[in-house]
């Protein structure tokens, strides 16, 4: 899928929003990708994840043995990527503010993990997810995401395979451009949810 095709899927789902948004990282942006709207449509989600799975296979072959995603945003694409790749799909979730495997999920030292995220902006959630996986003894070999908002600048600590890059400016709250200062901010992301 091309960048335009990926963004067309987001637009068609009403998921490419404009306004003043507080991102999960705390940065502010005039554009927000509301992936929940994309993921509410199974066929659209399947198309995007099928294309991402093909890209992952082209770069990694059959190296991954398990998919792990961070809750909450990564659960749906993680599940669909696991389905597309014929792998088990697990997720980490926050407990006392830190990602951990729960619900009886386990990894072994032999597991070669592909982390699957929805959108990568700064890479913070990715790094936290990878840290939790590393504590299990498993090896994270790469991360895959639908959209890399950083334009390739985010450092997640492992190779990042993005279906597309979509560089969107993001600003600290005290360095907003005038057009964002004039609009009330909303926080549509999931960081901080219980």
UniProtKB/Swiss-Prot annotation:
<keyword id="KW-0808">Transferase</keyword>
<dbReference type="GO" id="GO:0004588">
    <property type="term" value="F:orotate phosphoribosyltransferase activity"/>
</dbReference>
<dbReference type="InterPro" id="IPR000836">
    <property type="entry name" value="PRibTrfase_dom"/>
</dbReference>
<comment type="subunit">
    <text>Homodimer.</text>
</comment>
<dbReference type="Pfam" id="PF00156">
    <property type="entry name" value="Pribosyltran"/>
</dbReference>
<feature type="binding site">
    <location>
        <begin position="117"/>
        <end position="125"/>
    </location>
    <ligand>
        <name>5-phospho-alpha-D-ribose 1-diphosphate</name>
    </ligand>
</feature>
<dbReference type="InterPro" id="IPR029057">
    <property type="entry name" value="PRTase-like"/>
</dbReference>
<dbReference type="InterPro" id="IPR023031">
    <property type="entry name" value="OPRT"/>
</dbReference>
<dbReference type="GO" id="GO:0044205">
    <property type="term" value="P:'de novo' UMP biosynthetic process"/>
</dbReference>
<comment type="function">
    <text>Catalyzes the transfer of a ribosyl phosphate group from 5-phosphoribose 1-diphosphate to orotate, leading to the formation of orotidine monophosphate (OMP).</text>
</comment>
<dbReference type="GO" id="GO:0000287">
    <property type="term" value="F:magnesium ion binding"/>
</dbReference>
<keyword id="KW-0460">Magnesium</keyword>
<feature type="binding site">
    <location>
        <position position="149"/>
    </location>
    <ligand>
        <name>orotate</name>
    </ligand>
</feature>
<dbReference type="InterPro" id="IPR006273">
    <property type="entry name" value="Orotate_PRibTrfase_bac"/>
</dbReference>
<feature type="binding site">
    <location>
        <position position="121"/>
    </location>
    <ligand>
        <name>orotate</name>
    </ligand>
</feature>
<keyword id="KW-0665">Pyrimidine biosynthesis</keyword>
<comment type="similarity">
    <text>Belongs to the purine/pyrimidine phosphoribosyltransferase family. PyrE subfamily.</text>
</comment>
<keyword id="KW-0328">Glycosyltransferase</keyword>
<dbReference type="GO" id="GO:0019856">
    <property type="term" value="P:pyrimidine nucleobase biosynthetic process"/>
</dbReference>
<protein>
    <recommendedName>
        <fullName>Orotate phosphoribosyltransferase</fullName>
        <ecNumber>2.4.2.10</ecNumber>
    </recommendedName>
</protein>
<comment type="pathway">
    <text>Pyrimidine metabolism; UMP biosynthesis via de novo pathway; UMP from orotate: step 1/2.</text>
</comment>
